[in-house]
């Protein structure tokens, strides 16, 4: 059977890729090993967090689905880093895992131009030169032809789980690994490796003594992840906090030899910023305790997730260490924690469009690229899907820059630097994070989604109204001046005869203070919050914009693909090797490759500025 596009895998990357391509009117097939596990939250029952929440809102602004699914399935909402500046604040929501999964599958099933099929892809159909995709072959011998394929294997490509001495070829507990494509990819010359991740035990709610824990409530004022949603009124469940102690650490230390992580059996690098409890005890010996979050997995389940207690120790040891923790003395394990090791492709093998350099029409996204996390996977899946569709239309790829989005930072880091460990997004990875606030995701990206055809007229009109209203209120603030009769607050005295716009730049004055004086300035919380943040941080934002303009000149110089950098005189040997391997898309990307000197960039700039050599403007966003 023939399709325009095939998506391999039904995880968070696969969902976004399949929806994007089919919504752009291409006949799409998603093939996954188990249709009942589409959109499964394999590890923590939460979406969002620092930088991750920003990415979810960016996905939504571009026309992706993750924001709408979590808005539907959330059971608790919190804004993280509330006490800090807006650049590092981020929304995070606990999810009802089953509800999230069900909604994801339902969305796919109802989507026009999209078919779902349960099978395991074991090989590619390629042209005679073996450098262009023509389809896939499945475990049961089915052949499906297509012009593009998006590969999203998650932890399933030669996945292997570890619990003490127990080993099994699985990508998740009780779910079999995928084999076949690993040999195909190696045969095509892809640079591959092994990575490791892990998950903690789940326990029964009734076995927890919550009186010995700290309660963590959600925020009463919920900010929707999706810009298409208005005010959300949700029932919320509490999370709870407890801590490991000296006895917990002793149990782990006494049994460290039983951990496959330290016995040498696991060769893949684990996530640096989400270590197992064994790793924490070894690497942070000075710490007397580690924080553990007890998180509900849904409204209709008694299972609780022990965030911060990931482990691959034997089950009896896991039981002992859990029972040593206050509040968990009688905790009953329903599912053990485990480590999982899996194959990944070094993302340096990809163009910024996420298309493979070795095989035309093959796009790769998610954990297959060495990233970690649902949000990172979904972001890549969306961009891979968009660019696969643009390839089918014979159009230039859509490349988001580092200055436009966290998604741009994520992909640029992966394809420019590669990775040897699971890559996780942080606000600190973005040079211009004040410009990437979660509340401005629509301002930065929704027009792109609209122009592509992924954002409908209704959503775009709603955004234009918001944009117009923000500007109107700013103008009103510039026109309104503070008079003596307005002053009811001592803090305002020093601002007499100043306009409200400049008064609002004072950190001690809030927009609420000014609305009390002039109620006509009042509007929805979303609009007022954006007005206030835009004005208060205007100076910083303008300085960042000046820097971005200077960097933009480097982004504009597009470098040719498959170029022989050995012919350019003046480049260092290291630069020639790295440019040839990475094949940077722009001069800016070339400058970010580790080990590249400014002199190498100057040589490139002079070479491609020569009229004899081709210089193309890159319409990155």
UniProtKB/Swiss-Prot annotation:
Binding sites annotated in the UniProt record for NAD(+): 270-284
Cofactor: FAD
GO molecular function: flavin adenine dinucleotide binding
Record keywords: Cytoplasm, FAD, Flavoprotein, NAD, tRNA processing
SUPFAM superfamilies linked: FAD/NAD(P)-binding domain (SSF51905)
Subcellular localization: Cytoplasm
Pfam hit, one: SAM_GIDA_C
Range of residues in the leader sequence: none
Top-level division of the source organism's lineage: Bacteria
CC annotations in GO: cytosol
Assembly and oligomerization: Homodimer. Heterotetramer of two MnmE and two MnmG subunits.
Biological role stated in the UniProt entry: NAD-binding protein involved in the addition of a carboxymethylaminomethyl (cmnm) group at the wobble position (U34) of certain tRNAs, forming tRNA-cmnm(5)s(2)U34.
Protein name, entry field: tRNA uridine 5-carboxymethylaminomethyl modification enzyme MnmG
The organism of origin for this protein: Borreliella afzelii (strain PKo) (Borrelia afzelii)
């Amino acid at each position: 059977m023939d399709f325009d596009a095939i998506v391999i895998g039904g995880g968070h990357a696969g969902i976004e890729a399949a929806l994007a391509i089919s919504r752009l009117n291409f006949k799409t097939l998603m093939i996954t090993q188990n249709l009942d596990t589409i959109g499964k939250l394999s590890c923590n029952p939460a979406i969002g967090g620092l930088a991750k929440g920003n990415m979810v809102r960016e996905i939504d602004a571009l026309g992706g689905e993750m924001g709408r699914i979590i808005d539907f399935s959330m059971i608790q909402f919190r804004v993280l880093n509330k006490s800090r500046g807006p650049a590092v604040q981020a929304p995070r929501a606990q999810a009802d895992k089953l509800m999230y999964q069900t909604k994801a599958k339902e969305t796919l099933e109802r989507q026009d131009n999209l078919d779902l099929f349960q099978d395991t892809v074991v090989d590619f159909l390629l042209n005679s030169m073996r450098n262009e995709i023509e389809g896939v072959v499945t475990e049961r011998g089915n052949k499906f032809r297509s012009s593009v394929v998006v590969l999203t294997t998650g932890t399933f490509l030669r996945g292997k789980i570890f619990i003490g001495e127990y080993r099994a070829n699985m990508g998740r507990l009780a779910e079999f690994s995928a084999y076949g494509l690993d040999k195909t990819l190696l045969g095509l010359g892809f640079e591959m490796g092994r990575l490791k991740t892990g998950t903690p035990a789940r326990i029964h709610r009734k076995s927890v003594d919550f009186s010995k824990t700290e309660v963590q409530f959600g925020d009463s004022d919920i900010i929707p992840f999706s810009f298409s949603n208005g005010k959300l009124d949700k029932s919320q469940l509490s999370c709870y906090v407890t801590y490991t102690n000296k006895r917990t650490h002793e149990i782990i230390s006494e049994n460290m030899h039983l951990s496959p992580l330290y016995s040498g059996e696991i060769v893949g690098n684990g996530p640096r910023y989400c270590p197992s409890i064994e790793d924490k005890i070894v690497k942070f010996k000075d710490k007397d305790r580690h924080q553990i979050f007890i998180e509900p997995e849904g409204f209709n389940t008694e299972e609780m997730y022990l965030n911060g207690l990931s482990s691959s120790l034997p089950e009896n040891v896991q039981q002992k260490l859990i029972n040593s923790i206050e509040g968990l003395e009688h905790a009953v394990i329903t599912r053990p924690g485990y480590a999982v090791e899996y194959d990944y492709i070094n993302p340096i093998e990809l163009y910024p469009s996420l298309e493979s350099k070795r095989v035309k029409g093959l796009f790769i996204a998610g954990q297959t690229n060495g990233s970690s996390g649902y949000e990172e996977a979904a972001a890549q899946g969306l961009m891979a899907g968009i660019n696969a569709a643009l390839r089918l239309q014979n159009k230039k790829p859509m490349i988001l820059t580092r200055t436009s989005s966290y998604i741009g930072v994520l992909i640029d880091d992966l394809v420019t630097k590669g990775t040897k460990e699971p890559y996780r997004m942080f606000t600190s990875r973005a040079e211009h994070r004040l410009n990437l606030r979660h509340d401005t995701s629509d301002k930065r990206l929704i027009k792109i989604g609209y122009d592509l055809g992924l954002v409908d007229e209704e959503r775009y009109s709603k955004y234009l109204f918001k944009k117009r209203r923000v500007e109107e209120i700013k103008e009103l603030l510039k026109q309104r001046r503070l008079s003596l009769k307005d002053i009811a607050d001592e803090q305002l005295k020093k601002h007499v005869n100043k306009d409200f716009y400049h008064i609002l730049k004072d950190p001690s004055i809030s927009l609420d203070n000014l609305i009390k004086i002039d109620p006509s300035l009042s509007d929805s919380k979303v609009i007022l919050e954006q007005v206030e943040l835009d004005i208060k941080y205007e100076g910083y934002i303008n300085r960042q914009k000046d820097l971005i303009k200077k960097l933009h000149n480097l982004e504009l110089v597009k470098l040719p693909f498959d170029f022989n950098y050995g012919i350019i005189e003046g480049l260092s040997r290291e630069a020639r090797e790295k440019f040839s391997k990475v094949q940077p898309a722009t001069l800016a990307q070339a400058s970010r490759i580790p080990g590249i000197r400014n002199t190498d960039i100057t040589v490139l700039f002079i070479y491609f500025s020569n009229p004899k050599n081709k210089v193309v403007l890159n319409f990155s966003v």
